[in-house]
């Protein structure tokens, strides 16, 4: 009985481990999506994020696919040194989240 329980538990773990809710997209995939018109240009997305925090500089960007949607994440540092995380819908260009990095 213990073997059966262990087998069921291991099988359940293997099945759920395969589900990933967010997938990082590499540069080649990101450029392909941009060129196909699936996502906004990176310049436009960066401009939208920077407009939210004038005077900031971009420190990092990342494109992910989350729950079937393309999300562009931008990390900013403002003039006071405060870091911000801005997430945009990469297809529509709308800001989804904007919060101070803690």
Regions found by a protein language model. Give the residues of each.
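Long, terminal "pre-/pro-" and other extracytoplasmic accessory regions
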Residues: 2-102
């Amino acid at each position: 009985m213990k073997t059966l329980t262990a087998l069921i538990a291991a099988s359940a773990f293997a099945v759920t481990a395969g589900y990933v809710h967010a997938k990082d997209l590499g540069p080649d995939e990101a450029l392909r999506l941009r060129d196909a018109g699936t996502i906004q240009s990176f310049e436009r997305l960066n401009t939208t994020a920077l407009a939210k925090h004038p005077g900031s500089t971009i420190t990092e960007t990342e494109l992910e696919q989350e729950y079937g949607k393309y999300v562009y994440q931008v990390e900013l540092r403002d003039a006071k040194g405060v870091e911000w995380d801005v997430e945009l819908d990469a297809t529509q260009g709308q800001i989804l989240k904007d919060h101070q990095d803690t």
